[in-house]
Amino acid sequence: MSSQIDAVILAGGMARRMGGDDKGLVELNGEAMIKHTIDRIKPQVKEILINANRNQTRYAEFGFKVISDEHTGFLGPLAGMITAMGQTDADYLLVVPCDCPLLPTDLVPRMLAAIKAENAEIAVASDGEYEQPVVLLLKPSLRDSMKAFLEAGERKVDFWYAKHHFVVESFADQPNAFVNVNTPEQKQRLAMEITK
């Protein structure tokens, strides 16, 4: 039986290093950043949720359900994940940030295979050198654990998943897959990468 997989695109942050611009809506080569992310993951999942805490109407124009953090105060990616985990009945939830326009087109199958091979609860993507803590495939049943972690004042995603049985799936074969945009300079470099 094939596993049902939904996705959440995290666009709920403050984007301080982008001068406060809403990263998912910043244009990259004529399209909103989040549109590039959607195009990469849409063929790999059943449903997509967009986690946004501002500009929700703009995000809704992409045709997917927009959800805002249950926990107020811009508490970071865990808050968006918790909200999404409460909105899906899928077997697994893929978590990706809104500013990774070069995500692997084989992200889900490889991460799912890694989970199944190790009978793990979570798969974390890696670029071959570093883990990518906000590129995860996880079981939504872990929501209570994540909620308790956040409500205890913790914020770091990698500290949370370290408490569970997780596997790391390396995408060293796609070195630019997780390049993201935190500054206008990075945006410029990425625009050149996409047009190659």
UniProtKB/Swiss-Prot annotation:
GO molecular function: GTP binding; metal ion binding; molybdenum cofactor guanylyltransferase activity
Named cofactor requirement(s): Mg(2+)
Enzyme Commission designation: 2.7.7.77
Main location: cytoplasm
Enzyme's top EC category: transferase
Positions contributing to GTP binding: 10-12, 23, 51, 69, 99
Keyword Signal tagged: no
Subcellular compartments: Cytoplasm
Catalytic activity: Mo-molybdopterin + GTP + H(+) = Mo-molybdopterin guanine dinucleotide + diphosphate
Source superkingdom: Bacteria
Keyword Cytoplasm: yes
Key words of the record: Cytoplasm, GTP-binding, Magnesium, Metal-binding, Molybdenum cofactor biosynthesis, Nucleotide-binding, Transferase
One of the record's GO cellular component terms: cytoplasm
Biological function: Transfers a GMP moiety from GTP to Mo-molybdopterin (Mo-MPT) cofactor (Moco or molybdenum cofactor) to form Mo-molybdopterin guanine dinucleotide (Mo-MGD) cofactor.
Domain notes from UniProt: The N-terminal domain determines nucleotide recognition and specific binding, while the C-terminal domain determines the specific binding to the target protein.
Family: Belongs to the MobA family.
Subunit description: Monomer.
Name recorded for this polypeptide: Molybdenum cofactor guanylyltransferase
Organism: Shewanella baltica (strain OS223)
